[in-house]
């Protein structure tokens, strides 16, 4: 099987937790965190994969923010018969960017839908219904046990399947996937929170593994 991920916390989660059986089966767009790559990239990967491994699955992990940016290739995959398994993790907006805001000592601003001051009545997207409208099989799960059962159903299906799961926007990370991000902070500020965040940033930078 092949796994595809791109933006938010998912590259770190896949890197930390996915156990691959051979090289060339993990496609993580890590460098630029390219939101929207996940589904389109998976469709392209599936086209290539189906030539030599038609029985294998292509699995895409995508957050709700990236899904809303680019999802139309769900329809493409159904139309062309190139099956995907897509896991949509819904944290109510751009929770990783919100996390980075908070980690630098700042307040939440315009990243979680509920925090947008110009929205009078925030509402959730029905991702399950949206995926079904493009011809995919789709279901919503409430916990990891339901996720496992839904994933098995997706594996046995003969067409694109979308599994939707809500995750906590503040603590929805595994221990291994709780990656440190180098996000700069002001050097001069009156905010104690930002000064403390800057001290932590300076102490964490030397711990990074050098690129090869």
Feature locations, PLM:
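Active-site pocket-lining segments that scaffold enzyme catalytic pockets across diverse folds
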Residues: 1-9
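Thiamine diphosphate
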Residues: 13-212
């Amino acid at each position: 099987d092949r796994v595809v991920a791109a933006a938010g916390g998912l590259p770190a989660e896949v890197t930390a937790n996915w156990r691959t059986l051979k090289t060339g089966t993990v496609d993580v767009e890590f460098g630029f965190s390219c939101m929207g790559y996940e589904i389109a990239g998976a469709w392209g990967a599936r086209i290539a994969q189906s030539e030599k491994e038609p029985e294998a699955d292509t699995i895409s992990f995508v957050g709700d923010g990236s899904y809303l940016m680019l999802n139309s290739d769900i329809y493409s995959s159904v139309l062309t018969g190139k099956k995907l398994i897509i896991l949509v993790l819904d944290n109510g907006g751009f929770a990783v960017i919100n996390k980075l805001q908070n980690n630098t000592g700042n307040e939440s601003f315009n990243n979680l839908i509920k925090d947008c001051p110009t929205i009078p009545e925030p509402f959730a997207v029905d991702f399950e219904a949206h995926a079904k409208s493009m011809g995919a099989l789709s279901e919503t799960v409430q916990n990891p046990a339901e996720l496992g059962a839904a994933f098995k159903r997706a594996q046995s299906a003969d067409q694109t399947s979308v599994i939707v799961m809500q995750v906590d926007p503040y603590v929805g990370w595994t221990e291994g996937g709780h990656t440190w991000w180098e996000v700069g902070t002001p050097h001069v500020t009156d905010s104690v929170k930002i000064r403390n965040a800057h001290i932590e940033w300076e102490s964490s930078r030397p711990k990074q593994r050098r690129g090869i």
